[in-house]
Amino acid sequence: MPPKTRSGARRTGRRVVKKNVANGHAYIKSTFNNTIVSITDPKGAVISWASSGHVGFKGSRKSTPFAAQMAAESAARKAMDHGMKKVDVFVKGPGSGRETAIRSLSTAGLEVGTIADVTPQPHNGCRPPKRRRV
């Protein structure tokens, strides 16, 4: 039996399905080390995401407000390619990129509806990290 020959190149990866979603939710998780922006449809399925490290920042530069701005702009551009126009923003975490990320979502062209702070507050749960001595 002769060996089978393949014609054409093999395709790897998943195909990107364009969704046409007009409004959704933007979740901004801003920690002391990084900022992650996820944009979802109203049901919670992720349409686009970006983080400071994903945009190209490394090390301590990931925690800067400028890195958060670039991550939010990248996620907003990808979401607008899917037809996103309006987002409700949910911010979590104590990081420095919170306000900058919200501002850059609106300057990228998304209309920002409501802004909610959903940072979890412990009812005296885990012991916090020790104080830094510099």
From Swiss-Prot:
Family recorded in the similarity comment: Belongs to the universal ribosomal protein uS11 family.
Gene name of the encoded protein: rpsK
UniProt keywords, alphabetically: Ribonucleoprotein, Ribosomal protein, RNA-binding, rRNA-binding
Subunit structure: Part of the 30S ribosomal subunit. Interacts with proteins S7 and S18. Binds to IF-3.
Official protein name in the record: Small ribosomal subunit protein uS11
Protein source organism: Corynebacterium jeikeium (strain K411)
A biological-process GO annotation: translation
Pfam families linked: Ribosomal_S11 (PF00411)
Record's function text: Located on the platform of the 30S subunit, it bridges several disparate RNA helices of the 16S rRNA. Forms part of the Shine-Dalgarno cleft in the 70S ribosome.
Highest taxon of source: Bacteria
Transmembrane segments: none
Family matches, as SUPFAM superfamilies: Translational machinery components
Annotated GO CC locations: ribonucleoprotein complex; ribosome
Gene Ontology MF term list: rRNA binding; structural constituent of ribosome
InterPro entries the UniProt entry points to: Ribosomal_uS11 (IPR001971), Ribosomal_uS11_bac-type (IPR019981), Ribosomal_uS11_CS (IPR018102), Ribosomal_uS11_sf (IPR036967)
